Each structure stands twice: as C-alpha cells, then as structure tokens.
Amino acid sequence: MAHIPSVKVLVVIQADPLKSPRAVEALRIALGLGSHNEGNDLTIILGGRAPYLLANDTSNVVDSEILEKHLPVFIEWGTAFRIAPDAEVPPQWLPDCAIKTTTIQEIADAFQSADRVLVF
C-alpha cells in the first residue's frame, strides 16, 4: 500500500468565544482534521478574543460544555496553540495547555506552508 503524505492544515480562529459558538465549532472541526495523526500536521492560531477558549475559567464561553470535551484531546496530543501578537488573552490559562506566542512573520510562514487553511 502506497504511503499518502499528510496534508498540513492551518486553522485560524478569530471569532469571539464569549459571543459566538463559531470559536468552539472551529476547535471541533480542527479536532476532526487532526485526528488522523494526533494533530501532528495541524496548526492552530488564535487571534482577537479567541484565546479565551484556553482560559482557566470558560464558564462564559458559548458552548463551553462542548469545549470541555474537546480540549483534553489537544492537551493529550501536545498541540501548541499559537497566540497572535494582537490577541486579547485571558487572565489565567488552562493548566497543561501548550501556549506559544507567535509573530506576524510566523503567522505568514504558517499560511505559506499549509496545504489547507480554514479561517473562523
């Protein structure tokens, strides 16, 4: 059986999780796209207020019960959530979540190296 190369997927989430279910839905979609290889070819960039998805207290996040089911998988995979330089960040991050601040150049590089890009 021939080896099929993995597709590099970039998911950019800018939707405000405190106002819209789109941010949690974007993470659910990212989980599905990364599930074939435990997220190894998946990059997630959070901009705007999207970093609140990774807050220690997500009680104000729309669809937080769905978020609570999916975040542990990303933590298990060791997925690094990249935080855009202009993003609003929560006062306290969720423990064990891999957080990486990123530069505009790193974001541009992620777009260039991705085979597929989804923006929410």
Predicted regions and their residues:
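Short, glycine-rich nucleotide/cofactor-binding loops
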Residues: 11-26, 51-58
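Short glycine-enriched, charge-decorated loop/helix-capping segments at active-site entrances
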Residues: 57-62, 97
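A glycine-rich helix N-cap at a beta->alpha junction
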Residues: 60-87
